[in-house]
Amino acid sequence: EQRTIEEVSGFLGIPASSLIKSLLVIADGNQPVLALVRGDHELHEAKLARHLMSEIRPAHPDEVAEILGVEVGFVGPVGVPVSVRVIADDSLRPDGVGGARPYVVGANQPHAHLSGVVVGRDVTPEFADLREARAGDACPHCGAQLQVEQVLEIGNIFKLGTKYSAPLKATILDESGKEHPIVMGSYGIGP
């Protein structure tokens, strides 16, 4: 009963990069979204939220079962209900660096996985930059390798927009006397 990327990879004797991780999240309005990243990559939830222009949260195991009809560990992108939006990381593009290649994915059936699944043929998701960057990745602008360094935060900016002002009905009047929600931000110096 292999559920995790590591367990499936070890059982099949293939690298994690030959698997696709399928992660169900819930966006605003209870919209189910299936995010796909290569097995050796991690989903960057903030990137997905920014792409969706929505707040997101991981689906609870009972939601996964209700929406996809299978328990966590066997979720895959093939044959998901049309109500589920499927978004794959750019690294899975069939016309990308790796090209169209076969992957192992969850089968959306208990204790089962599918092999030979090709993105673009067996599943046609939309694509976005969804994965966490890591040391050695190429810069998308110049191609130089990314280096990861230990740093100290000296300041931060949180662009809150109207997330808090709109529900609180905190408004300002424009020149014509029309109300608009206050656009908020939080700016800090130091950790």
Spans of model-derived segments:
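Extended, low-hydrophobicity, polar/charged segments
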Residues: E1-P191
